[in-house]
C-alpha cells in the first residue's frame, strides 16, 4: 500500500487526537465519545482505517478498546464470532480467554469475545457519526461523496450488528448526552434497506475505485454488494416477515448485468499460483487480475498498517514453525481446520485416494510409521530428522510432503478443486484429520488459503506484518447470491452462476441445484473468510440438530445446541448501563 489514500489513513489516525475510549467503555454504556476536531480529507481516510487498525500507535500501545489490542480489531472480532464457532476451524489453545465458549457454542452475556466485537462495532459507529455530524454543513460534490462513503461504513457496521446480535444500539448523531436506542429485527433491516437506497446514487459509480490510487474506497459496487447480502438474509433478519429474494437478484444484476465487466473473476494462473489463490496473496492490491475481483477490501500493509487483527491474524494464526512456503516470520500455531472443513474437499467415503490419506492421518502413530518408512536409509541435514520432521529443512519437508501425499498440491489434485488450500504435510509435526481432545495445532489440517507471499515472487514489504488486503466483498459472492436467491424465489436451477466459480477452480461442474449444493458451494468458495456462521444460520444448519460437526456443543463427535445460539447475546455491560437495550431470548 504505497498509495496516497493509505498514507492519509495513517496520518488521519493521529490527526484525530483521540484518547482511548476504553475507560468510558468500562464504566458506561457502550457508546464511546470524545471531543475532536477534523482535518478534512485525512479524516475520511481515518474512517476506513478503523477496519484494519486497532489504535493509534501501531499494533499496540494506544488501543481503541481496553483489552488485548490485537484481539479487538474490527475484522478479528467479527471473524472469530463467525468462524471459531462454525464447522470450519478450531483454536488450538483452549485455555485462552473465552475460547471454549466459541468452540463449543456455549457463550453467555458475560463472554469477553462477544463483548469485544460489540464494543468495536459501537466504537467505530461513533467515529462515523462524529465525522458525519462535523461535515454536515460542508458543501460540494466531493463532500457529498465522502459523506456517502462514511454512511456506507456505518451501514456495514449496523449490518454486522443485525447479523450477529439481531439488534443494535442505534444512533445516527454524535451526542455524548444521549444513549443509543434499541433497533432490532425488521426495523433495523428496513433502516439498512432505506439507508443503502439513499446513499447508492451519491457514491462513485461501480468500479470507480478499482484502481491502485483509490483501492479500498467504497463505490456503488460495494453498496450493491451489501444490499444483495442484506436481501439474501431477509427472512432470517426479519423473523420471516420479509423474503426479498428478488431484491437480492436485482442488486446482483446491477453488478453482473448493468455493469458487466467492471469486476471479473481472477482466473489465470500466475507463476504457479491459481487465480483463486491470487485473491488472497500479499500483492492483491497490485495484481490487477486479483484487484478486478475485489469489490471492497480492507487495506493492509506490512509497513503502514501494523496490526494483529487483520490479515496478519489470518496468516500467522494458521501457521506453525516448520511449515513450508510460510511467507512470514510470525507463526502462532493457533487456528486449524475442523474435520468438517477437510472432508468438504476430501471425499473419504467415495474417493480411494482421499480415503488412503485419511487413514494415514487417522492417528499420529500411523503418520509416523509412513514417515519413518520414507526416511529410512536417507540422509538429512540435521540429526534426528529421520524420526522427527520438525528437524527437517524446508526443502526436506517439501520432498517428504510430495512423497507422503500431504502437500497442498496433492490435496488440490485429490479434491479436484483449486480452492482446497489445505496442508496435511509434516511441516511442524505430524497432523491428524481429527482428534478426540483438542491439545494442539496439529490436531487437524492447516489452512493455507491466506498468505503473504506475492504472485510475482517479489519480497513482501515486511517479514512480520502482512501486506494481504482482506476482500470483504468480492465478485464470487455476487454469483452465489444470485444463484441462491433464484432457487429460494422459485426453484430456478441457476447452474451457470455456480459453475462460473467451479470452472475457475477447475472443479467438475454441477448438474443440479438444491440447498445442499448451494451450502456446499458457499463453504468451498468462502471458507475462512469470516462469514460461515451467517451462511449456516440462513440454511438452518447452525443451531439445532440438522447438521452436526466435530466439537459442536462441546463433544468431539458433535451434538445439538439450542436454537437461541443462532444470535449472540447483548453484553451484560451494555444492558446494565443502557436501559434502552434488552437482552436476547434465553440469555
Feature map (PLM): residue ranges:
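Long, intrinsically disordered, low-complexity segments
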Residues: 20-27, 40, 121-122, 185, ...
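Membrane-proximal, proline-rich intrinsically disordered regions
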Residues: 21-75, 577-587
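Short, surface-exposed recognition loops and adjoining beta-strand edges that mediate ligand/DNA contacts
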Residues: 31-38, 58-82, 204-221, 236-322, ...
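Conserved, well-structured interaction surfaces
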Residues: 41, 45, 49-54, 89-165, ...
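Flexible, polar/acidic helix-loop-strand segments at domain edges
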Residues: 99-106, 116, 343-474
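Short coil/turn linking the two alpha-helices of tandem helical-hairpin repeats
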Residues: 162-164, 169, 207, 233-240, ...
